[in-house]
Amino acid sequence: MIRSATLLFSSLLFAIHNLGQGVAQGPPPPPSAKTIKCKGRTIPQLEDVTEKAGIRFSHTSAPESRYIVESMSGGVLLLDYDRDGWLDIYFTNAPTVDMALKGRSARGALYHNNHDGTFTDVTDKAGVGKPCFAMGGAVGDYDNDGWPDIYVTCYGGNVLYHNNGDGTFTDVSKKAGVDDPTAITG
């Protein structure tokens, strides 16, 4: 009994002593990656490749402005809307209050992944450019047809885009009963 207790106590001391002694590290970055050295460790550096990737989207709302509706907008949805195995990108958008007062609006944007590190804006072709004060969004298959649908939470009425399975979407907000003008954040 004493021998078992001693063994258990020794094992616990060993475990506690070695807890957190090692730090898991991933593989080193490829030779072409930008890196810096910090305390002898290689740290990868991020490079902005937005333009090279073909993404020309600009979020127009102004979070530093005085109206709360401006500070709560913005969202990014990753989805494979055409089920080709590559993630596509949907950006939500909202105008500033000043833009809205002048009758201007802001649309979200859907970018198709070209499988080569670039993207193509397919917003108009896909039919997902309805302007709104977007607060965020979600992706899901609301009708269980196997295709990802897009739900955008908006101040002034949410938008539900049904994926038609052919690269296009249909706005079914009213039919689905989600176009309530109550402010909803996502």
Question: Which residues make up each language-model segment?
Answer:
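Acidic, glycine/proline-rich Ca2+-coordinating loop motifs
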Residues: 1, 18-186
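Bacterial N-terminal signal peptides
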Residues: 6-18
